[in-house]
């Protein structure tokens, strides 16, 4: 088994790197979107407890829906590929970030709030100088939980053509190849452990937290945004479709060609009919 894993890592090095990049890009893009939704929403609702509780209930209900069911519901609406995978991951990631941000902002000691008001700080200045710095450890904890969950769940993107490390797991299951399953699972676990450790490391020190937050934002916005956009809007590719001998396979490959060219007029589709087998 050990030799088989080493051989696969060497022979499939390019595919593994590509799948890892896809996995990270999908995860970071999903995290970025979830943060842009959850953190501002928690800030807006920190003084509206009933609405915030209702939002938490809705987010909790979404968390109980199986991921495969969400993907199945999204396919008829947005099709297959990266888009439904990102939407599903965002839905799962919102609750921990929103819950922790809201808790961090609402559990600040009242005497500190009163002191800030007595100094004449506006709501924005109070948020900027008092509330967000005090709530930041809780916010980072929510982001860490969401990111680990996203990285683990992103393996399901392979089921709908979204790419990522799940392609190795899926290929291994279909071909009864335990080596592929182990490689996909171990790499996913390593990514989850690394990003969890990174966020925990920067949250233990104020200076480290500031530098780390800037680095994470740059990484998420740059790598996640650019790679995620590439995954959602891939460059035109050449497609080769092979079919067995006979009239029915010949009809099928021509149908596939028409369907592909309807979706992407620039796609170059090459047909290879009359394959034996």
Regions found by a protein language model. Give the residues of each.
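Transmembrane alpha-helices
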Residues: 91, 124-156
């Amino acid at each position: 088994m050990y030799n088989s894993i080493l051989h696969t890592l060497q022979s499939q090095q390019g595919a593994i790197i590509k799948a890892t990049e896809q996995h990270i890009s999908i995860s970071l893009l999903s995290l970025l979107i979830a943060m842009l939704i959850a953190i501002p929403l928690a800030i807006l609702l920190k003084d509206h407890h009933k609405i915030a509780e209702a939002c938490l209930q809705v987010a909790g209900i979404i968390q109980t829906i199986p991921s495969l069911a969400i993907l199945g519901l999204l396919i008829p609406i947005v099709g297959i590929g990266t888009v439904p995978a990102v939407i599903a991951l965002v839905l799962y990631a919102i609750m921990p970030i929103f819950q922790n941000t809201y808790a961090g902002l609402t559990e600040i000691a009242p005497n500190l709030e009163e002191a800030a008001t007595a100094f004449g700080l506006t709501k924005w200045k109070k948020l900027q100088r008092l509330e967000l710095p005090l709530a930041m450890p809780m916010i980072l904890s929510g982001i860490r939980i969401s990111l680990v969950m996203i990285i683990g769940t992103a393996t399901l993107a392979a089921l709908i053509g979204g790419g990522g490390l799940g392609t190795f797991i899926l290929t291994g299951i279909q071909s009864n190849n335990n080596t592929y399953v182990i490689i996909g699972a171990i790499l996913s676990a390593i990514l989850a452990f690394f990003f969890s450790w990174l966020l925990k490391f920067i949250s233990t020190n104020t200076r480290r937290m500031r530098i780390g937050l800037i680095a994470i934002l740059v990484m998420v916005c740059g790598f996640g945004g650019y790679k995620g956009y590439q995954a959602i809007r891939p460059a035109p590719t050449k497609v080769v479709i092979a079919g067995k001998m006979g009239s029915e396979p010949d009809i099928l490959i021509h149908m596939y060609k028409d369907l592909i060219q309807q979706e992407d007029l620039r796609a170059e589709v090459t047909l290879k009919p009359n394959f034996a087998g």
